[in-house]
């Protein structure tokens, strides 16, 4: 493998992508800047987009794929395919899709169950090989958490209800750091402060409408022009130093 291949990750803290609500109304599309940058990183005008919605239950993965297909195919002219979780044990099928893809995108959902499934099937190793080969690895929420050493996750809330706590968990470890998506949501910043007391990682927290782009050893933020929820999008770096908790905005 060439030493000149760049490794690329775009980790989106959250944001709406134009999906339909249960009442038939459509949410806005907030992530244009992030999606355009993901495409730009491939170096191709019409790259191949592979959606892996494994943080969702199998029965929800097709609907999520159609939302992302409307963005990447209809808006931007990408060729779009998906890899559903019930196909992960089909080694040749998985290899064919991964080899085809320029972009590999994971959506939002249950990070804990997703990482467990990837490790049980060996798909975690497949994803690492894809990243090392220069494919753009990206996603939102759970699909952002997964690339880092650790994350703060609401997986128990998703599975069992809002009375469950936020948890810290190990992820794929492509990038050092404890990643926090939706850090503008109640309790998130307090949770990462506590998690970092017993972790040797640095906290990397992204609000909705903010993405952290990592190309090799270079980091930068991608921030949406406007937020549907009316928040000021931002990213934070946080850590403990000699008993003092430090939290700084990432510029």
Specify the residue positions occupied by each region the protein language model found.
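Structural motif
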Residues: 11, 103-107, 138, 179-180
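Catalytic-core regions built around general acid/base machinery
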Residues: 97-100, 120-134
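Portal/gating segments that form or line small-molecule/metal binding sites
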Residues: 50-109, 113
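Short glycine-rich anion-binding loops that position phosphate/pyrophosphate groups of nucleotides
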Residues: 15-17, 109-111, 143
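Glycine/Thr-rich phosphate-binding loops of Rossmann-like dinucleotide-binding domains
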Residues: 19, 114-115, 148
